């Protein structure tokens, strides 16, 4: 995934 997507996912977790 893109760094932006990964950041969003990590934020949800």
From Swiss-Prot:
Role, per record: Mast cell degranulating peptide. Induces the chemotaxis of neutrophils. Its mast cell degranulation activity may be related to the activation of G-protein coupled receptors in mast cells as well as interaction with other proteins located in cell endosomal membranes in the mast cells.
Superkingdom per UniProt: Eukaryota
Annotated localization: Secreted
Modification type Leucine amide: residues: 13
The protein's name in its UniProt record: Vespid chemotactic peptide L
Originating organism: Vespula lewisii
Molecular function in Gene Ontology: toxin activity
Gene Ontology CC, one term: extracellular region
Keyword RNA-binding tagged: no
Tissues/organs with expression: Expressed by the venom gland.
Similarity annotation: Belongs to the MCD family. Crabrolin subfamily.
Secretion signal span: none
Organismal lineage: Eukaryota, Metazoa, Ecdysozoa, Arthropoda, Hexapoda
């Amino acid at each position: 995934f893109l760094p932006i997507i990964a950041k969003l996912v990590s934020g949800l977790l």
